[in-house]
């Protein structure tokens, strides 16, 4: 939690650094090196976002406390999926969420970080497809 709070404090001071650091948390260094157009596209999207609004959303992420009673009301089959190397929304957090949501399945994407749906699209999509095929 302390890391996330420190990150939030740093984001308030330096918009450029916060975007670059976000992308380094979201993608592996190898992916960034090999996929400059994707990196630049997402960087451009972040650049267009209001920094003030970004900070509001991140503040909510930093200080919000989940209400397990509300989460326990979810009864729909649910896939909780994250990259195994996600440092922001850690796999432990997702696994704990899957323990609270009845009828949920927890999966990690090997070598993935926060945007594993982009970086590891094939395995991510296979995992989602298998979940849908087994639960619909």
Task: Kindly label every feature range from the protein language model.
Residues 40-67:
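Hydrophobic, aromatic-rich cap/lid helix
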Residues 48, 64-65, 84-88, 115-119:
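A short, basic/aromatic alpha-helical/loop segment that forms part
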Residues 76, 90-99:
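Short alpha-helix in the alpha/beta-hydrolase fold that links the catalytic acid
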